[in-house]
Amino acid sequence: MARYLGPKLKLSRREGTDLFLKSGVRAIDTKCKIEQAPGQHGARKPRLSDYGVQLREKQKVRRIYGVLERQFRNYYKEAARLKGNTGENLLALLEGRLDNVVYRMGFGATRAEARQLVSHKAIMVNGRVVNIASYQVSPNDVVSIREKAKKQSRVKAALELAEQREKPTWLEVDAGKMEGTYKRKPERSDLSADINEHLIVELYSK
């Protein structure tokens, strides 16, 4: 399955919620009618079965983190093997992706932009360049912008934008040095209440 390259707002309208695929310079409800389905007049959303609700939740989370279907299923399998709550383990694995950590630290305005920084070798982990977006960041790892990439206007713009967002408590960021520390894995209470991971577990448990 190829990565989706179409209109980002269309995906948010399909899921009926902001997937944070755009930079956030303007509120998403000023860009499109988020409550309406895609299409000129917004097709009426059908009443979903239990399976349909579970599938939509999985698609929503997968799109938020920019993960392909096969990758997402593999994350679920790994989450199920780990001790503890499978749903919470799944979210922790997704949050631990390098592209997501770069976004959370404010170095990228969106996860897609953060992923691009990683693939363009602009990101270092503990002083070494890592260009794999799915790389799992571990507690106490230091993530930083390479010296030659610090002058990029998009990085500076992203950091300014990040000042308007709530700062994650599991990260410690020095915006001046353009580096941050992944202090710990986020707990469920740290993350969005708009995600219902239990529906995803129910979907894959069938």
From Swiss-Prot:
Entry annotated with the keyword Ribonucleoprotein: yes
> GO MF annotations for this entry?
rRNA binding; structural constituent of ribosome
Query: Impact of mutating K206T?
Result: Confers streptomycin independence on streptomycin-dependent S12 mutant P90R. A RAM mutant
GO cellular component terms, alphabetically, are:
small ribosomal subunit
Q: Where is the signal peptide?
A: none
Q: Looking at the record's lineage, which domain of life comes first?
A: Bacteria
What keywords is this UniProt entry annotated with?
A: Antibiotic resistance, Ribonucleoprotein, Ribosomal protein, RNA-binding, rRNA-binding
List, for all copies, the residue spans of the domain called S4 RNA-binding: 96-156
The answer to keyword Cytoplasm applying to this record is: no
Q: Which InterPro entries match?
A: Ribosomal_uS4 (IPR022801), Ribosomal_uS4_bac-type (IPR005709), Ribosomal_uS4_CS (IPR018079), Ribosomal_uS4_N (IPR001912), S4_RNA-bd (IPR002942), S4_RNA-bd_sf (IPR036986)
Q: Mind telling me which Gene3D superfamilies this protein's record contains?
A: Ribosomal Protein S4 Delta 41, Chain A, domain 1, RNA-binding S4 domain
Q: What are the recorded Gene Ontology BP terms?
A: response to antibiotic; ribosomal small subunit biogenesis; translation
Family annotation (PANTHER family): 30S 40S RIBOSOMAL PROTEIN, SMALL RIBOSOMAL SUBUNIT PROTEIN US4M
Q: Which family does it belong to?
A: Belongs to the universal ribosomal protein uS4 family.
**What the protein does?**
One of the primary rRNA binding proteins, it binds directly to 16S rRNA where it nucleates assembly of the body of the 30S subunit.
UniProt subunit comment: Part of the 30S ribosomal subunit. Contacts protein S5. The interaction surface between S4 and S5 is involved in control of translational fidelity.
Write down what this protein is called: Small ribosomal subunit protein uS4
